[in-house]
């Protein structure tokens, strides 16, 4: 055994990869309704790290790379919808601040009851909320061992309790009249419709505000592309595309559902999915691209990952998007030339924008701000890249630089970064977890961590319910409140809903700022 541990201690990269592989295997095993997913790397890291303290030494740079990759890519994904959702989420953000303050107060009170030191409480607060506030806590306590013990014991508690709470609420359905409908949940449908009245396309409910699109128009036996300026006459047939509720309203206005399926007739008009790989289109809205002038066609849908969206004029194209374009049959090649339609091209990572964006995030995170009473504040290697990613994700491009990554590339980098980070945390925390987990102090830390997290999380979830926001947005808000990447990953594996990442991004950045401040207050009280 000594020979093996000596070998692994001198080959840390091999050790990390073993933890990643075994953690991925553990993450696929179901424990009732719960599956650890990426968090399996954390628990395997704890097991392996407990074998020899040397496994967890000098992992700061590798761990930092993992957290930067994860947080920056999450920021890019959340940034595209964050600004539009800000008005809807300000209440959740306020609830998150209240929840963090209540957790700090409860931690101090329960800590004194169980005989824990302020250093213990500062460590467990940073650990159960899985935040970079541990750096601030260590500085405030001058590197006290109690701080690191509290962090090591409470970190896994934050993961387990967080996963359980997400499993409980992620698939719930409660009244959410103040939330927008999930694009993934609503889905899209296309209905061939017979026109029973004299009207026009612009008069159709939902057309002017981009809730429905029309493509095929059959008149007097001739098929052509419908345009916004077309008048519709009795006997015409049109294809209406949108989510089911909007399509039903449009069909009721126009006439009735046709027995004929217009999309089956592809002699004059045809349709195909094209991959967006043309750099000139990335970061631009659909409305700013002259699709009709260059192809005599029209885009009706945009598929991003597993999400199929109606082609609204304000949708910003990202590399790897798959647009469904209806064009005259002889102009399919023109549409392919316009969008690029190259899988190989979008599979390449734009190292310039990725490296520059992440570097800007690290610079932002390194800015130190001095506060009264000797307090210091910096975003750190997690919140800095996240905030920068959200900023760059919202502006999409700067001159020739395209900040967004293809959806598949973003997902791969995010998952890789997350598992590297969790594996390193597990390896570094293993010895302390093994030595203290079953002691009186260790059990007290675990109990206080679990109780305070449930209390703080309940405040955020209750706030979402009171504000009539969806359970899925509440799930993302809770994951961002905790700040645990594995919880976000688990939530996304349960529900395909873009509101989860939007809420996560909103609370993660703000929560990190508040945690860094409160953890220093805990030490001073």
UniProtKB/Swiss-Prot annotation:
Family named by the database record: Belongs to the AAE transporter (TC 2.A.81) family.
Signal peptide: none
GO cellular component terms listed in the entry, alphabetical order: plasma membrane
Domain RCK C-terminal: start-end pairs: 178-257, 259-341
Protein name, per record: Uncharacterized transporter PPA2034
InterPro entries (UniProt xref): AAE_transporter, RCK_C, RCK_C_sf, YidE_YbjL
Protein's UniProt keywords contain ATP-binding: no
Protein location: Cell membrane
Alphabetical list of Pfam families matching this protein: Asp-Al_Ex, TrkA_C
